[in-house]
Amino acid sequence: MPTFASGAPGRCTRRADLRVALGIREWNVFGDSYGTNLAMTLMREHPQGIRSVTLDSVEPPEVVTAGSFAPNAREDFDRLFRACTAQPQCWPRRPGIEQTFTQLVRRLEAHPVATQVVPLTGGSPVKVVLDGGRLVNWFIGEAFNTAAFRNVPAMIAELANGDPRPIATEVASRVVSSGIGILGYGLASGVGCAEWVPYERGSVVSIGRRAFPAYPVSVFRPALHVTYLPQGWTVWKVPKAPAEQRAATPSTIPTLLLAGSFDGITPTSWARTAKRTLPNSTLAEFAGIGHFVTLASPCAQQVFASFLATPSTPNTACVLAVRPPRFAPAPPARG
C-alpha cells in the first residue's frame, strides 16, 4: 500500500516538487470532491507558487468522517423536497413528497421488492432488489447527475404507485457503468479508512439515526453511502492518518469555493466551513446543482474563468439567475 503510506501530505509534496521540476513559477490549483481536501493540504503545507485555488464540491479535512454523510444527505433531501413543494406541478398528491419517501423507505426495508430491468447502457436484463437502504442510496447518488434531478419526484411517485422499474433501472445502470473498478474502490477505501474512520465522532449508526429518526435503524447497517467503512477498516489495515492532516486550512491565497445546493455528498455547509479560514475567498452557491459543480453549470464555468483571470475580483453575477430545475410532473396516485 505505498500510495496510502504517505497519505495526503506525501501526495501534496510530490505535486509541489513537480511544479519546481517543471520550472513553473506560479500555478492555479483546482480540486474537486476529495481533491479539494488535497488542495487545502497543499495550501497549508506548500503555499509557495500557488497563484489561486478553486475548490469545487468542498470537503474540509477537519470535518469529514464516514458518519458525516448522513447529515449531508439530510441537508440535500430537505432542499430538494422544499424545491419540489414550491412547484405545484411537482407533487400534486397527498401525502407530501417527504412523508411519501419516508413511508417508502420503511416499507421497502421491511419488504424489499425485486424486479428485472435493462440498464440504461443496454445489455441483458439484471435483477435489482430495492430495499429501504438502496432507495436512500439511490437518492444520494443523484448528486452525481444534476440533469436527473428534475425526474426525482416523478420517480418517487411511480414507486409509490407500485412501479419500481424507473428507480431500479438507474440503480442497475450505476452498477454496470460506474467504471470505478477494483483500484478505484481500493483508493476510496484507503482514504476513508486512514483519514475518516479513526476520527469518527460517534457511531455512524447513531449519527444516521439522528439525521433520519423516522428511518429503520437497519438502513444504517451498513447501507447508507459509506457507513460500511468502520467495518472495512478492521480488514483493510491502512495506517491511521496523522491528526495534523485533518487540520483546518488558514490561508490568504485567493480561493474560489463552488457548492451545489443539491449536493448530498459535500453540502454547501461544508463550503461555508472551509471559507471561515480563507479570508481572500469567494463562495458561490448554485441552486439545483449537485456534485462536481463546474461540470454541471455553465454559470459555474463562467465564474471559474473569471476567477482565473482576476482571482481577487471574480464576476459572480450569473449565480443570482441560477434556479432549481423545473421538475417533471409527478403522476397522480393510483387507487
Residue ranges and their predicted role:
Residues 148, 264-270:
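Conserved alpha/beta-hydrolase "acid-adjacent" motif
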Residues 254-262:
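Conserved strand-to-loop "acid loop" that flanks and positions the catalytic carboxylate
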Residues 41-104, 138-141, 154-179:
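A catalytic-pocket lid/entrance helix-loop region that shapes and gates access to the active site
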Residues 29-31, 56, 258:
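Short beta-strand immediately N-terminal to the catalytic nucleophile in serine-hydrolase-like folds
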Residues 100-253, 296-297, 313, 324-333:
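Alpha/beta-hydrolase fold active-site neighborhood
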Residues 11-26:
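Conserved acidic catalytic loop of the alpha/beta-hydrolase fold
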Residues 287-335:
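Catalytic active-site module of serine/aspartate enzymes centered on a nucleophile-bearing elbow/loop
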Residues 13, 31-43:
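Glycine-rich nucleophile elbow surrounding the catalytic serine of serine-hydrolase chemistry
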